[in-house]
């Protein structure tokens, strides 16, 4: 068993050798995860349907489509995991191997989600800082290629993590090396996300040549902020605390469930962010989900957007008179 995902074992221990109180799962948190995942799956399914079948593909929409796919995958893993925890709580049968597999499977969408978010922030940062170079040298299908590479790399890391954890008892050094690689990769992604987001924020808000604020940059900023608050703690718990061999006793052994709830909130919040940003300052009669999502991903300043909308309405009125 991979020590990075040994939270199931720490929570089901009746009494440890130090005499600390029993650390059983908190049922309220499991039900909270169930509710959060259902809401998040509904929102991400709508995003997948709109971007996959109802809207024209653009560079940013390819990233958002894959991010919604990673969030849905992650929420599915935690939905089933919480269901098994509730079954265990009431004394019904739940195979331990299934929970271990789910714990390792959730690593795949977690890595891919962070990678896609870092790619979005980095690409928009390059577009703002060096626009001419970016538009001249960017390959046409770069978004799809990057997302495909991210998924392949995430699956390879997830499979390696599971396999090394399976052999962890006899090959202790193996899972340590694999976990070190995954931890280093996550730290690199976090630094890339933080650096590119900070540079993008400074370029938009500060300096003599500030870039006009658009809905797309508001969407990216809110998504990154929610991830840093809600999504990052789970990664710190799984890949740093357990890699350094920190054993959490009561009441800190419940940190895994708390970070799981926060990470589910992070994956569920992204569709809400898209629809809130897209529906801001929009007339109610024009609030179709497709239109709202399209506006949330538009890289057009508010003034230009208002002008284009006003010209479009004027054209429609003039055409209706003839």
From Swiss-Prot:
SUPFAM superfamilies: Family A G protein-coupled receptor-like. One of its GO terms (molecular function) is G protein-coupled receptor activity. Expressed in a subset of IB4-positive small diameter nociceptive dorsal root neurons. GO terms for biological process: chemosensory behavior; hematopoietic progenitor cell differentiation. Its main location: membrane. Residues 52-59, 122-142, 201-223, 279-322 are cytoplasmic. Glycans are attached at residue 16. It is found in: Cell membrane. InterPro entries: GPCR_Rhodpsn, GPCR_Rhodpsn_7TM, MRGPCRFAMILY. The chain crosses the membrane at residues 31-51, 60-80, 101-121, 143-163, 180-200, 224-244, 258-278. Keywords: Cell membrane, G-protein coupled receptor, Glycoprotein, Membrane, Receptor, Transducer, Transmembrane, Transmembrane helix. Orphan receptor activated by neuropeptides terminating in Arg-Phe or Arg-Phe-amide. Mediates its action by association with G proteins that activate a phosphatidylinositol-calcium second messenger system. Its effect is mediated by G(q) and G(11) proteins. May regulate the function of nociceptive neurons by modulation of pain perception. Belongs to the G-protein coupled receptor 1 family. Mas subfamily. This is Mas-related G-protein coupled receptor member X1. It comes from Mus musculus.
